UniProtKB/Swiss-Prot annotation:
Protein family (similarity comment): Belongs to the UvrC family.
BP-aspect Gene Ontology terms: nucleotide-excision repair; SOS response
HAMAP family, per database record: UvrC
Keywords: Cytoplasm, DNA damage, DNA excision, DNA repair, Excision nuclease, SOS response
Species this chain originates from: Mycobacterium marinum (strain ATCC BAA-535 / M)
Domain spans labelled UVR: 208-243
Known role: The UvrABC repair system catalyzes the recognition and processing of DNA lesions. UvrC both incises the 5' and 3' sides of the lesion. The N-terminal half is responsible for the 3' incision and the C-terminal half is responsible for the 5' incision.
Cell compartments where the protein resides: Cytoplasm
Gene Ontology CC annotations of this record: cytoplasm; excinuclease repair complex
PANTHER family for the chain: UVRABC SYSTEM PROTEIN C, UVRC/OXIDOREDUCTASE
Subunit description: Interacts with UvrB in an incision complex.
Protein name: UvrABC system protein C
Length: 647
């Protein structure tokens, strides 16, 4: 691995002007492309303190063997050159927005003599117009079925088209007027293309014009007493309206805008964009990408900048053949934050569009509400991505193998247990222990602990709490292992008799050393112990001064992160439950023999604890299920200063 000091340029040799830089590996391959307002400031930050760089950035700097740069006149030129180089070199450490091929789109093959409407999944191609994506293929077919009444464009494959051309007879859609039958010459090539262009215009948001035209034609036919044609036009108008109703108005001013939102965790970010044309949502797209890691720029600003540059640059290269509109760049782009070079980005986008493009953060009204909806979609997309990735067998196998190799284990850790501590300023201190087997959660084995020795009187010691939980968990393991009566009839271990291959604690060196010391004290030597620290996602092992840095895109780190997050969730859930019970506790809780149902009956009967406190034994025994002994115990609990509680 190259030493960054061997290729670090002298700060004085780096220009202060804006420009674009490239990192190359020892084989000369470009592994990262970036741009900067000041090349000297940005490049110096990569080498100033490598230990404090984000893991992905640190890996890039230590993988590279050379850095070079190109000076440009303006930041807009730097933006364009960065985009071109990323397209040319496809650097491994750059975030790339690739099409999500899992959702179907409506494709219009404008590159054919007789364009076709079809359901499509796959990479975008030049000369093909796309609308969507849609959640289901049937949603596309339903839309096409409605609109081909008005825009009878071809929907058949090339094989079907040629066959009907040979037999000189249209298909069924041609007979019922849902296809203009260009295969038999019913319309010319130019007429059919006009039909397709009108179809595309309608889906692009120019809906009102066609609705007005149909209404005018219908009225004219009725005035000419051509009622059959008027009825057909009426049905066509109804079909258009039903298609329009499927896309509700979200912006009352009829704005053309793209609304962008992000959701992220420690490793990845989900990107969602809603395409609004004519005030209606015409499409939705999403990606999940690795988080960018430039050392001196906020993550959200980097996400906004990189998304705008790559997405709209790609759309412009398709020559307007995208699903967003005839012009792939809308008049307005709504983003969660404005990057520092927002003016330059706006100028670049304006150049792509040919007219002014505004970047804006929505603050109120319909646009703010829509941005919040897109944000919720981004969060849901990230969650679905995490669940899908965790459930994939190949990914889980790779994750376990990654962990085995990174930690130097003899075998893959098929059973992983993780401990997390939760409290609020030392109160209600609890711990959780979650179990993953074969990379998936085994929720029946989850346990929670109320911390006894390491907490109390508003104090909490996370290190001591980790040690206490570890001791209790593995003492149970040893006791169940030594007592055959605790085994099930099938010989399977109950509770904690089955030890983990890997024991994970939430924290750094102090926590992992505490857990390791307990295992050593108990004589357990076949359980590996690690700590996973937050923020930098460092993996700590006992008695080692430095952590292990696993690649941020590795399946192994992803699994460890998910195990840790699940332990955190389970601990917080138990902590909230315990805190809620404490805050809602009453003096009645301590009355022996008084269960929850009879407590509720008493409070319901008297209306409050204060009124119950003023009652007599006879009044309390009037409540169904309450005897004299219980009534006396209730009054003793409520009136500790009055012996016997008698009144």
């Amino acid at each position: 691995m190259p030493d960054p000091a061997t290729y670090r340029p002298a700060p004085g040799s780096i220009p202060v002007e804006p420009g674009v830089y490239r990192f190359r590996d020892p084989h000369g391959r470009v592994i990262y492309v970036g741009k900067a307002k000041s090349l000297r400031s940005r490049l110096t930050s990569y080498f100033a303190d490598i230990a404090h760089l984000q893991p992905r950035t640190r890996q890039m700097v230590t993988t590279a063997a050379k850095v070079e740069w190109t000076v440009v006149n303006t930041e807009v030129e730097a933006l364009q050159l960065e985009y071109n180089w990323i397209k040319e070199f496809d650097p491994r450490f750059n975030v790339r927005y690739r099409d999500d091929k899992s959702y179907p789109v409506l494709a219009v093959t404008l590159n054919e003599d007789f364009p076709r409407l079809m359901v499509y999944r796959g990479p975008r191609r030049k000369g093909v117009r796309y609308f969507g994506p849609y959640s289901h293929a049937w949603a596309i077919r339903e839309t096409v079925d409605l609109l081909t009444r008005v825009f009878p464009a071809r929907t058949c494959s090339m094989g079907v088209f040629k066959r009907h051309k040979q037999i000189d007879r249209p298909c069924l859609l041609g007979y019922i007027d849902k296809c203009s039958a260009p295969c038999i010459g019913r319309v010319s090539k130019e007429q059919h293309r006009q039909i397709v262009d009108d179809f595309c215009d309608f889906l692009s948001g120019k809906t009102d014009r066609y609705a007005r035209e149909l209404e005018q034609q219908m009225n004219a036919a009725a005035e000419n007493l051509d009622f059959e044609r008027a009825a057909r036009l009426r049905d066509d108008r109804s079909a258009l309206k039903r298609a329009m109703e499927k896309q509700a108005v979200v912006l009352g001013d009829g704005t053309d805008a793209d609304v962008v939102a992000f959701a992220d965790d420690e490793l990845e970010a989900a990107v969602q964009v809603f395409h609004v044309r004519g005030g209606r949502v015409r499409g939705q797209r999403g990606w999940v990408v690795e988080k960018p890691s430039a050392p001196d720029v906020s993550v959200e600003e980097q996400l906004v900048e990189q998304f705008l540059a790559q997405f709209y640059g790609d759309q412009a290269e398709l020559g307007g053949a995208a699903d967003e509109s005839v012009n792939p760049v809308p008049r307005e782009v709504l983003v969660p934050c404005l990057p520092s070079n927002a003016d330059q980005l706006s100028s670049w986008l304006s150049g792509l569009r040919g007219s002014r493009v505004t970047l804006r953060v929505p603050r109120r009204g319909d646009k703010r509400a829509l941005a919040e909806t897109v944000q919720r979609n981004a969060k849901e997309a990230l969650q679905q991505h995490k669940l899908k990735r965790a459930g994939d067998f190949n990914a889980r196998s790779a994750a376990l193998q990654n962990i085995q190799e990174a930690l130097g284990l003899a075998d893959a850790p098929l059973r992983i247990e993780c401990v997390d501590i939760s409290h609020v300023q030392g109160t209600d201190v609890v711990a959780s222990l979650v179990v993953f087997e074969d990379g998936l959660p085994r929720k029946s084995d989850y346990r929670h602990f109320a911390i006894r020795e390491a907490a109390g009187q508003g104090r909490s010691d996370d290190v001591a709490s980790i040690a206490e939980v570890t001791r209790r968990r593995f003492q149970r393991h040893l006791s169940e292992q030594n007592d055959p009566n605790l085994l099930s009839p099938e010989g399977k271990s109950r509770r904690f008799a089955y030890p983990p291959n890997l024991y994970v604690v939430d924290g750094g060196a102090p926590q992992v050393n505490a857990a390791s010391a307990v295992l050593e004290e108990l004589g357990i030597v076949d359980v590996a112990v690690i700590g996973l620290a937050k923020r930098l996602e460092e993996v700590w092992v006992p008695s080692e001064p430095d952590p292990i840095i696993m690649p941020r895109n590795s399946e192994g780190l992803y699994l460890l992160q998910r195990v840790r997050d699940e332990a955190h969730r389970f601990a917080i859930t138990y902590h909230r439950s315990k805190r809620s019970k404490r805050m809602t506790a009453s003096a009645l809780d301590a009355v022996p023999g008084l269960g929850e149902h009879r407590r509720k009956a008493l409070v319901t009967h008297f209306g409050s604890i204060a009124r119950l406190k003023e009652a007599t034994v006879d009044q309390i025994t009037a409540v169904p299920g309450i005897g004299v002994a219980t009534a006396t115990a209730v009054l003793e609990a409520l009136r500790p200063d009055q012996p016997g509680g008698a009144q």
